[in-house]
Amino acid sequence: MKTLKNLISLIILTVCAGSSAFAQNTPEVKLDVPYVPTRPAVVEAMLKLAKVKSTDILYDLGCGDGRIVITAAKKYGVTGKGIDINPERIKEANQNAKEANVTGKVNFETANLFETDFSQATVVTLYLLPSVNLRLRPILLKQLQPGSRIVSHDFDMGDWKPEQTIEVDGATIYLWTVPAKK
């Protein structure tokens, strides 16, 4: 069942990627992952699973419209950063932050995830494809401090077993805590 659900998610992500490429009038940006927004109930569950608190610094990788970072700032007082390779998504995220009155708590940047420093983050959220999660895993483990939490919507990190997995609104959410450095 889980494999079928992941297959359906991959198909939806692929279809959305194809249709959004035709709809945009901006120069083509090479995307590793299509933009599919995380539903509000899933955003709330991700933040709750990570036990987000006001002292956390949350990074959302592939932030899209910024909804996870913005929700964390509004609900928990978190300082956050959203990173996306698509400048149109960053423009939208900045507008959403302005409308939510959280521009002093959040920022968004257009960047390549594989060339970004995550070392300040205490919580990392992501809704990326399995292949991207696997490429990011060694970077996150190297850069993040022990005790930092990683929460993924729908896709795991290969053979790194999550500490906790929950189902919310048809989505699977995974939680890992960065272990002590060896």
Predicted features along the sequence, with ranges:
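Conserved SAM-binding motif I beta-strand of class I
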Residues: T79-D84
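Glycine-rich SAM-binding Motif I of class I
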Residues: G66-I70
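C-terminal substrate-binding/active-site "lid" region of AdoMet-derived donor-dependent transferases
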Residues: S131-K182
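A short SAM/SAH-binding and catalytic strip from SAM-dependent methyltransferases
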Residues: S119-R135
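S-adenosyl-L-methionine
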Residues: K2-I12, A21-D56, P87-Q120
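Gly/Ala-rich phosphate-binding loop of Rossmann-like dinucleotide-binding domains
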Residues: A73-G77
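Conserved class I S-adenosyl-L-methionine
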Residues: T55-G64
